[in-house]
Swiss-Prot record:
<feature type="binding site">
    <location>
        <position position="242"/>
    </location>
    <ligand>
        <name>Mg(2+)</name>
    </ligand>
</feature>
<keyword id="KW-0964">Secreted</keyword>
<dbReference type="Pfam" id="PF03952">
    <property type="entry name" value="Enolase_N"/>
</dbReference>
<comment type="pathway">
    <text>Carbohydrate degradation; glycolysis; pyruvate from D-glyceraldehyde 3-phosphate: step 4/5.</text>
</comment>
<dbReference type="Pfam" id="PF00113">
    <property type="entry name" value="Enolase_C"/>
</dbReference>
<feature type="binding site">
    <location>
        <position position="313"/>
    </location>
    <ligand>
        <name>Mg(2+)</name>
    </ligand>
</feature>
<feature type="active site" description="Proton acceptor">
    <location>
        <position position="338"/>
    </location>
</feature>
<dbReference type="GO" id="GO:0005576">
    <property type="term" value="C:extracellular region"/>
</dbReference>
<dbReference type="InterPro" id="IPR036849">
    <property type="entry name" value="Enolase-like_C_sf"/>
</dbReference>
<dbReference type="GO" id="GO:0000287">
    <property type="term" value="F:magnesium ion binding"/>
</dbReference>
<dbReference type="InterPro" id="IPR020811">
    <property type="entry name" value="Enolase_N"/>
</dbReference>
<dbReference type="InterPro" id="IPR020810">
    <property type="entry name" value="Enolase_C"/>
</dbReference>
<dbReference type="InterPro" id="IPR000941">
    <property type="entry name" value="Enolase"/>
</dbReference>
<keyword id="KW-0479">Metal-binding</keyword>
<dbReference type="GO" id="GO:0009986">
    <property type="term" value="C:cell surface"/>
</dbReference>
<dbReference type="GO" id="GO:0000015">
    <property type="term" value="C:phosphopyruvate hydratase complex"/>
</dbReference>
<dbReference type="InterPro" id="IPR020809">
    <property type="entry name" value="Enolase_CS"/>
</dbReference>
């Protein structure tokens, strides 16, 4: 085992041109780990705090020099000398050093950068790929991509209310073929949109962002693209939605679909999602209701929880306390896992473990503001999660994760598993 001899943070840019934190950790063996921290656009109110400088004269107030300084001046002196493989102790030390419930003192972006860089350095020290260091000898499940190919909401400058329309290649025999299927549908979608005279500009996550007559039209053009690519909707490829309903939820307690000019109550939202699920091959809905609409979520779960995957993102924010509440209430049946929502690798793994024990799936996810860091690719295999959400097959910040998964599948060889439809163990057959 090797101890930490140096920790250094710097300010770099993410995929939106905003600053973020990158951390390097060096061990006395010479092993080095480097990690960059992502950033979300539609963020849950209960997420750990991303520390920004607020100095409008630099990066419009979005600088992260305070977080960088916190790593270099406060966290580093505390952790230097600790054993890199003591991940739980290291993360615990940072949580205690911060001392707030939401990491607002040091910043979740500072703490997470160190947490992940430590894990990477320890993996290198052990001579193991990161996925195997995290998951051990049984880390072998490649994820079904939940690929966002059409963007709306906060991820795009268009009139589509639902934030993400995604495809999932459940009929693929392995990850490599799954990625090919998604890429072919993506290119066919571009042609379909072109043929209708619609825009093929892309949103933050690489999906197309056209103006459409309705949210339902988005589903229809994707189904057309799936068929044009030679695949059967509902068999080869299924659909997933992320309405990001918290963004639609207003002070009147109702959901405002501003693109369509429609206002819905919680009960009407449940009716709306049920109608879409009955009409189209939708297998997963994320954040179908707002983060504090627990009663609405309970109704949604009662109506659709045995039929499709209901993913809590803003609802759970990778937080075991909120997940525990959801489990006890019988709300949702899946959790979205975003490292920077909670701020340490240890707490992320705790949330995944709690979800699995309760029969909930865990979907490992990127953020809309990403970097070339591909840690989540290793994480999703390490914990055998079976599903990953990391954008369209466009923009290097997204493709970096897919390419890392291709490499991992290649290394695993015949031991690699791709679960397809069996990834949804939370849906009662």
């Amino acid at each position: 085992m090797s101890s930490i001899i140096d920790i250094f943070a710097r300010e770099i840019l993410d995929s939106r041109g905003n600053p973020t934190v990158e951390v390097e950790v060096e061990l006395d063996s010479g092993a080095v780990g480097r990690a960059a921290v992502p950033s979300g656009a539609s963020t849950g109110a209960f997420e750990a705090v991303e520390l920004r400088d607020g100095d409008k004269s630099r990066y419009l107030g979005k600088g992260v020099l305070k977080a960088v300084q916190n790593v270099n001046d406060i966290i580093a002196p505390e952790l230097i000398g600790m054993e890199a493989q003591d991940q739980v102790a290291i993360d615990k030390a940072m949580i205690e050093l911060d001392g707030t419930p939401n990491k607002s003192k040091l910043g979740a972006n500072a703490i997470l950068g160190v947490s992940l860089a430590v894990a990477k350095a320890a993996a290198e020290e052990c001579g193991l790929p990161l996925y195997q260091y995290i998951g051990g000898v049984n880390a072998k499940t490649l994820p079904v991509p939940m690929m966002n190919i059409l963007n709306g909401g906060k991820h795009a400058d268009n009139n589509v209310d639902i934030q993400e329309f995604m495809i999932m290649p459940v009929g693929a025999p392995n990850f490599r073929e799954a990625l090919r299927m998604c890429s072919e549908v993506y290119h066919n979608l571009k042609n379909v949109l072109h043929s209708k005279g619609l825009s093929t500009t892309v949103g933050d996550e690489g999906g197309f962002a056209p103006n459409l007559t309705s949210n339902e039209e988005a589903i229809q053009v994707i189904l057309e693209a799936i068929e044009k690519a030679g695949y059967v909707p509902g068999e080869d490829i299924v659909l997933a939605l992320d309405p990001a309903a918290t963004e639609m939820y207003k002070e009147d307690g109702k959901y405002h679909f501003e693109g369509e000019g429609i206002v819905r109550t919680s009960a009407e939202m449940v009716d709306f999602w049920e109608q879409l699920v009955n009409k189209y091959p939708i297998v997963s809905i994320e954040d179908g209701l707002a983060e504090e609409d627990w009663n609405g979520w309970k109704l949604l779960t009662e109506r659709l929880g045995k039929k499709i995957q209901l993913v809590g993102d803003d609802l759970f924010v990778t937080n075991t306390q909120r997940l525990s509440k959801g489990i006890s209430m019988g709300v949702a049946n899946s959790i979205l896992i975003k490292l920077n929502q909670i701020g340490t690798l240890t707490e992320t793994l705790d949330a995944i473990e709690m979800a699995k024990r309760a029969g909930y799936t865990a979907v490992v996810s990127h953020r809309s503001g990403e970097t070339e860091d591909s840690t989540i690719a290793d994480l999703v295999v390490g914990v055998n999660a079976g599903q990953i959400k990391t954008g369209a097959p466009a923009r290097t910040d997204r493709v970096a994760k897919y390419n890392q998964l291709l490499r991992i599948e290649e290394v695993l060889g015949s031991t690699a598993q791709y679960l397809g439809k069996n990834a949804f163990y939370n849906i009662k057959k």
